[in-house]
Amino acid sequence: MFGTLASGEIETARLNRNLGITSNLGVSCGGFEDFAMRFEGENMVPYKGEEQEEEEDQVVVNETTPFQFQQPLFLQQQQKLVVGYALTSKKKKSFLQPKLELLARRKGIFFVAIDLNRPLSEQGPFDVVLHKLLGKEWEEVIEDYQQKHPEVTVLDPPGSIQRIYNRQSMLQGMADLKLSDCSGSLFVPKQMVVLKDSAASADAVVEAGLKFPLVAKPLWIDGTAKSHQLYLAYDRRSLAELDPPLVLQEFVNHGGVMFKVFVVGDVIKVMRRFSLPNVSNCEKAKVDGVFQFPRVSSAAASADNADLDPRVAELPPKPFLEALVKELRSLLGLRLFNIDMIREHGSKNVFYVIDINYFPGYGKLPDYEQVFVDFFQNLAQVKYKKRQHCK
């Protein structure tokens, strides 16, 4: 079989006669107009336009003359990209939506599930490995694969991911980011780690200069719902109700709005989410104990269309975000992450980073599918240019 040809003005009978093909000829209208290609099994089959079909009218195929097809230059430069993925079932369901897979296929990007029961090096070949699995064993598998296949882009390196799964190391180095020339100031809330005996940590909290109320977060992010549970501790005695290991972070009033900054390579998208309301001095004096609050980053908590005070709702300045993300990509060594930011209440451009997440819930982001298709296309172009340079 020589390939699948797109239907056009040429009649099937004339194709059969000129090419000497009988039942082996497949005729299809194609479905990949953007790249003019179809994917069948493991083969990319070129879509042929009217110009090329006219040229083929002059081709005579017989037993001694093999059929050859020369792709136009613009088709030769558009490369197929195979993305092997290793995701939890929940992440696969939320990320690999039908629309994403359809748009990707139209651009020559194909997602292939990695079989966790087989050696990774025996699978593929892959151009990109996209993963979000926890555990030392998987981390070792990916690191070994990277050493054996340096030509494959791994999103993202396990060592870099591990750093932000620990809330103590997650925000380290933020103070050293070079943002002095930007239209905003960046801080991290004062925090401390409690490894055991939360009740006995009350004195350490005072010594560290932290002021109540405190946001309490589990130290480790392990993919469970419990690792994302957040509490607000109003006084010293309430610390005894918390289970270590955990991070205690000073609560910063921020008008009840949080900014989720999504990063996909060089692309930045920002969404507003409802968060905890401000805590007044009067409330601090009257309220005690621990308050467990829901995950304020949930899709239901979107504040993008809410009627908010403009001083609270105004997004962080674009130059500030661009500089911050550029520095963080370098510091963290990640390309897929999001930043949870708040603006200090009463200020215009004083911001705090309170959390960083690897490979977050992009499915909540409008038009995330096109963002990722563009991202993978860029990876394909970079790989193509590297191959051309090495020739």
Curated annotation (Swiss-Prot):
For this protein, the record's InterPro entries field holds:
Inositol_tetrakis-P_1-kinase, InsP(3)kin_ATP-grasp, ITPK1_N
Keyword Metal-binding in record: yes
Its Enzyme Commission number? 2.7.1.134, 2.7.1.159
> What are the names of the required cofactors?
Mg(2+)
GO molecular function (one): inositol-1,3,4-trisphosphate 5-kinase activity
Taxonomically, the superkingdom here is: Eukaryota
> Binding residues for Mg(2+) 1, per the UniProt record?
340, 355
- The question of whether DNA repair is a record keyword is answered with no
The record's function comment reads:
Kinase that can phosphorylate various inositol polyphosphate such as Ins(3,4,5,6)P4 or Ins(1,3,4)P3. Phosphorylates Ins(3,4,5,6)P4 to form InsP5. This reaction is thought to have regulatory importance, since Ins(3,4,5,6)P4 is an inhibitor of plasma membrane Ca(2+)-activated Cl(-) channels, while Ins(1,3,4,5,6)P5 is not. Also phosphorylates Ins(1,3,4)P3 or a racemic mixture of Ins(1,4,6)P3 and Ins(3,4,6)P3 to form InsP4. Ins(1,3,4,6)P4 is an essential molecule in the hexakisphosphate (InsP6) pathway. Plays a role in seed coat development and lipid polyester barrier formation.
- Protein's recorded name: Inositol-tetrakisphosphate 1-kinase 2
Q: Which organism is it from?
A: Arabidopsis thaliana (Mouse-ear cress)
